[in-house]
């Protein structure tokens, strides 16, 4: 099935997946001698799967649509709502170059473009197409490489099962009673939006997100938290887009304040996306095919189609924050990494490594996320990428779990009614630095 689909990809790319161990920052590049010594003593990473969020985009609502939430006009963006910006595309290209630098330093990436081993898949939205094109160009510059995706007019059920990306909000969830930290963040966000405090705000007609009566009603509280999470993320995106600081949050929130406010986005997703009923509804299909890809690489026969040939060494999927939240729920983790308060930043990723050691296959899970200043500057060197390793379900807290234990534990968390056996017939698209506005 994969021979024809991936033939040109396999003739264009070569990528091994020896990746770093966990630390607070992505480790600095090793010297060739260090890499050779490590390769001789370390376990072999047979496959790495990277599920990454797209790059910096404009808010999904226009400034006019957002106007009712704030006392002052929202900034104008150089692209249509929801689209990747040129800054976001440049960031994804720089992030791809950072992965390239890291993997080349470990003799994991062939510098001459020849050979096989890597597959890049993107969701069908324009921002994901543009992100994949830019990331792949950064990873393999001048290689005339390709990524796989459906046309922008078609939904990809790997990323949005049944085109119901918001219907998992209706999945059973615990009754929402915002805690003290969330209420404090709501008050702080309202001060930023209103530009006032206390009685001075009484004359404003915009709906208040910190209204105690609304927060006492669990149904209303869920709606408030969803709106607040989206608005807080919009402010974060203004900073990440490198807008002039007086325009970011109307000059009323610095980077530290934005990092605190984005906790509302995390809280919203913890309730509506990461909670296991919602995660099973939205993430089962994607995780089923990720696990099938790992099985194929380990020489097993999966029940559903893998996403890449068995000899693939690296698989990169450009998805959304919702995909990362669904996977985090299925993995049973709260994916906060020290140094980045946003659980799902642009360019942030969850990584699954299939490791062979002493004749046995193991699975390990990691987060690699850029910091907020890194996104603003589009510089991903040094401590600008943070990493954390996670235990997997059923593994007793171990950071490297036998595949024979991790696989059935993860499969048991899937909803079989939300899994399609086949993989969409995606086509190849050329990698290039995306040209998407200013």
Where do the language-model regions lie?
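Signature for phosphate-centric chemistry
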Residues: 32, 37-119, 123-315, 321-438
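Intrinsically disordered, low-complexity regions enriched in Ser/Pro/Gly/Gln/His and often acidic
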Residues: 5-7, 19-20, 70, 422
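Bacterial N-terminal signal peptides that target proteins for export
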Residues: 2-16
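Bacterial N-terminal signal peptides
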Residues: 14-24
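Membrane-interface motif at the C-terminal end of an N-terminal transmembrane signal
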Residues: 27-28
């Amino acid at each position: 099935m994969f021979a024809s689909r991936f033939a040109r990809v396999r003739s264009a790319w070569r990528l091994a997946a020896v990746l770093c161990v966990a630390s607070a920052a992505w480790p600095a590049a090793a010297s060739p001698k260090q890499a050779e010594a490590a390769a001789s003593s370390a376990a072999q990473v047979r496959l790495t799967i990277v599920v990454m969020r797209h790059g910096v985009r404009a808010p999904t609502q226009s400034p006019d649509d957002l106007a009712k939430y704030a006392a002052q006009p929202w900034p104008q963006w150089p692209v249509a709502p929801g689209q990747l910006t040129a800054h976001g595309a440049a960031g994804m290209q720089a992030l791809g170059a950072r992965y390239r630098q890291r993997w080349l330093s470990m003799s994991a990436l062939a510098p001459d473009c020849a050979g096989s081993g890597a597959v890049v898949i993107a969701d069908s939205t324009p921002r994901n197409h543009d992100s994949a094109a830019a990331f792949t160009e950064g990873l393999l510059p001048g290689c005339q490489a390709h990524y796989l995706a459906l046309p922008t007019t078609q939904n990809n059920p790997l990323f949005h099962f049944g085109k119901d990306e918001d219907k998992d909000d209706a999945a059973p969830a615990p009754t929402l009673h915002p805690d003290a930290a969330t209420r404090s963040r709501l008050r702080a966000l309202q001060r930023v939006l209103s530009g006032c405090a206390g009685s001075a705000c009484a004359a404003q007609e915009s709906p208040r997100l910190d209204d105690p009566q609304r927060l006492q009603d669990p149904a209303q509280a869920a709606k408030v938290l969803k709106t607040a999470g989206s608005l807080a993320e919009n402010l974060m995106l203004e900073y990440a887009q490198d807008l002039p600081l007086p325009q970011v949050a109307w000059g009323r929130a610095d980077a530290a304040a934005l990092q605190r406010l984005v906790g509302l986005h995390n809280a919203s997703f913890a309730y509506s996306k990461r909670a296991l009923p919602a995660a099973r509804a939205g993430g089962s299909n994607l995780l089923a095919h990720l696990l099938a890809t790992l099985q194929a690489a380990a020489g097993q026969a999966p029940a559903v189609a893998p996403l890449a040939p068995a000899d693939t060494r690296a698989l990169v999927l450009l998805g959304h924050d919702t995909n990362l939240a669904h996977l985090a729920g299925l993995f049973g983790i709260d994916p906060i990494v020290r140094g980045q308060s946003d659980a799902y930043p642009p360019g942030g990723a969850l990584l699954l490594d299939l490791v062979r050691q002493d004749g046995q296959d193991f699975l390990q899970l990691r987060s690699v996320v850029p910091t907020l200043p890194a996104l603003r500057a589009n510089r991903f060197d040094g401590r600008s990428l943070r990493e954390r390793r996670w235990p997997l379900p059923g593994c007793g807290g171990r950071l490297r779990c036998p595949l024979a234990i991790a696989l059935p534990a993860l499969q048991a968390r899937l909803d079989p009614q939300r899994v399609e056996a086949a993989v969409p017939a995606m086509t190849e698209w050329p990698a290039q630095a995306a040209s998407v506005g200013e």
